[in-house]
Amino acid sequence: MELKRVVVTGLGAVTPVGNTPEEMWQNMVNGVSGAAPITLFDTSLFKTKFACEVKNLNINDYLDRKEARKMDRYTQFAMIAAIQAVKDCGWDLEPEDKNRIGVVFGVGIGGIKTFEEEVSYYALNQENGPKFNPFFIPKMIADIAAGQISIMYGFHGPNYITASACASSSNALADAFNLIRLGKANAIVAGGAEAAICATGVGGFNAMHALSTRNDEPEKASRPFSASRDGFIMAEGAGCLILEELEHAKARGAKIYAEMVGAGMSADAHHITASHPEGLGAKLVMQNALEDAGMKPEEIDYINVHGTSTHVGDISEAKAIKEVFGDAAYKLNISSTKSMTGHMLGAAGAVEAMATVLAVQNDIVPPTINHEEDDKDPEIDYDLNFTFNKAQKRVVRAGLSNTFGFGGHNACVVFKKYEA
């Protein structure tokens, strides 16, 4: 069976550094940090008092006020990113076979804020008996984002969410890619969403010592591959990519951002939260993705790394890149856009895949910000080009994006310039 080709024809973004793909990309290229003191809840008793929140977004510009109230914040973000992407791809939905358009979204945590609110209310009012919002469960469940998007557009194709912690939306893209190239769908609205900046989310990650506590200078806290890194920054938002079968896209005259050519998956099988210290899972997933894409290491010009600004994770990923790419590792560009967006958890893969697509399209590599020349970790090879502090113009023939999740879940997606 000949596999079909898959292209990216639409983008949507709700992020801490911009609420459209254009705004997000411009701020990434300019090295803008989305970190600031948390406004979504009172952090006075918390170790970490800052995060990368979505700012200046009017939900009601996109969603009916009454309907939006029935959704958790993460679902609102997913809906808005999908609305942008569907509009961007230029679909005339009237003649489309909606039975062959699906929705696959990645969600790592889901409606944790809704859960927090409902359980807190119950705990404070137990003597009055159980009283819950009738929308509690449909707001909270992780699959509802994909369901709501399909309901909005009437898409009857494959519809589900993927949940693999921080790799969730990369897995969603991988699944969407495979569904299309196997002929199971003409197009998939694929992406990820997360909104876990609440007392439960931040408190839980603080208890694990996973978050940076650089409260005096939040915008400088995420510093992947620097010796002084002290954990990641919680972030929220959503990213959406329209993946479409090539001939279907050409037939309707769609613009094409890039071609998706491969996806890899692997497991560390090592620890519930820590990366394998030698980067075993990271090595396997990049090898799998390159094999799936039919590409050699020297054909990759850019890696958007997982790069969360954690001690073990950054070291192990850098080791894995050297092992997989050999001499070619020193010729490509590496960057962590999490240094600007923070860690968007289940949405990270989609937003970082979008950054990779835009790097391929525009021949610009966004930077890894916050590195200082004298802040070098002896366990990291700085002959690798981490694109520190300033975007770099270069031809980007192809790029890959890594995401690694708690539980040892690893996913990698590959995009290249579209050639007819």
Task: Describe the role of every protein-language-model region.
Residues 1-67, 89, 247-259, 354-368, ...:
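ACP-dependent fatty acid/polyketide chain-elongation machinery
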Residues 1-8, 95-98, 293-299, 330, ...:
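Flexible, low-complexity linker/loop segments at domain and module junctions
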Residues 5-9, 36, 216-293, 302, ...:
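Condensing-enzyme catalytic core mediating Claisen C-C bond formation in acyl metabolism
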Residues 8, 23-24, 32-164, 193-202, ...:
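Conserved beta-ketoacyl condensing-enzyme motif
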Residues 10, 28, 82, 103, ...:
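Conserved small-residue
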Residues 39, 184-230, 263-277, 307-314, ...:
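Acyl-CoA/ACP chain-elongation machinery
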Residues 78-91, 145, 150-153, 158-194, ...:
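Active-site-proximal alpha-helical scaffold in enzymes
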Residues 123-133, 174, 178, 194-251, ...:
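Glycine-/small-residue-rich "gating" segment that lines the acyl/pantetheine channel
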